[in-house]
């Protein structure tokens, strides 16, 4: 057991999906995994392990933001030796050619979080996805005929930010805004593990188009299937 995850070591697979919402973790386990059992309920952050096409897979809620996901992925790697971590989450588009429900593969992320500047003594470390995971996910998405976008995302430290620089970020090619990828990629690099963020556009910051909270919790199956297929091909 770790501080925030109440599982025994053998109860968590070495490949894991990471939704922010614990109810989405429950949905993934019940919808896609066979024989899924719940290994964690600490703080209501649900975690499950089951099989997908004969491969053992876990899914763990992480909460929102850099501090929360950092706790869970650190404990998953440090205490449970998880090797492959794939975030499945939502993001807000800031490019006109990125549409609601498009799937984004985050190649890298920039951030206004101070996490890496504190870690690297002021250096602007550039967190990146694992290339094997990124390439595999892209190929799977194309096989499925999905509207995939590959590029940079922005990991925001604040959800409600009156001084957001979204227009400038868009000019520099950033596709969308979310709140966790920088932490995932940085910590995966620290521990020598594979990581990827597979994101569904839940709303468009420029146009105001959005999905409902219920849709964000229980849909976006294409993203989940891409993540699961990517995990089992590793």
Swiss-Prot record:
GO molecular function: purine-nucleoside phosphorylase activity
A cellular-component GO term for this protein: cytosol
Database matches in Pfam families: PNP_UDP_1
Disulfides per UniProt: none
Record-listed phosphate binding positions: 20, 24, 43, 87-90
GO aspect biological process, one term: purine nucleoside catabolic process
Superkingdom of the source species: Bacteria
Positions of a purine D-ribonucleoside binding: 4, 162, 178-180, 202-203
Active site: 203
Keywords recorded for this protein, A-Z: Glycosyltransferase, Transferase
Reaction catalyzed: a purine D-ribonucleoside + phosphate = a purine nucleobase + alpha-D-ribose 1-phosphate; a purine 2'-deoxy-D-ribonucleoside + phosphate = a purine nucleobase + 2-deoxy-alpha-D-ribose 1-phosphate
Known EC number: 2.4.2.1
Family in the record: Belongs to the PNP/UDP phosphorylase family.
Quaternary structure, from the entry: Homohexamer; trimer of homodimers.
Entries under PANTHER family matching the protein: FI09636P-RELATED, URIDINE PHOSPHORYLASE
Function: Catalyzes the reversible phosphorolytic breakdown of the N-glycosidic bond in the beta-(deoxy)ribonucleoside molecules, with the formation of the corresponding free purine bases and pentose-1-phosphate. Cleavage of adenosine and its derivatives.
Protein name: Purine nucleoside phosphorylase DeoD-type
């Amino acid at each position: 057991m770790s501080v925030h995850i109440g599982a025994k070591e053998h109860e968590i697979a070495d490949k894991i999906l990471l939704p922010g919402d614990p109810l989405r973790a429950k949905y993934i386990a019940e919808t896609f995994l066979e024989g899924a059992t719940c290994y964690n309920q600490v703080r209501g952050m649900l975690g499950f392990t089951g099989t997908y096409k004969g491969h053992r897979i876990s899914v763990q809620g992480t909460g929102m933001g850099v501090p929360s996901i950092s706790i869970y992925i650190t404990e998953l790697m440090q205490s449970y030796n998880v090797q492959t971590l794939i975030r499945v989450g939502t993001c807000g588009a800031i490019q006109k050619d990125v549409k609601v429900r498009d799937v984004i593969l985050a190649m890298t992320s920039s951030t206004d979080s101070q996490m890496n500047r504190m870690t690297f003594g002021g250096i602007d470390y550039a967190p990146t996805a694992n290339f094997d995971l990124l390439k595999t996910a892209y190929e799977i998405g194309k096989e499925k005929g999905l509207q995939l976008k590959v590029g940079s995302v922005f990991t925001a430290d604040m959800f409600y930010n009156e001084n957001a620089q979204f227009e400038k970020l868009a000019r520099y090619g950033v596709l969308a805004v979310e709140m966790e990828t920088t932490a995932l990629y940085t910590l995966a690099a620290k521990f020598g593990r594979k990581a990827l963020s597979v994101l569904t556009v839940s709303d468009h910051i420029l146009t105001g188009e959005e999905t409902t909270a219920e849709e964000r919790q229980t849909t976006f199956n294409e993203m989940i299937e891409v993540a699961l297929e990517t995990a089992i091909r590793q």
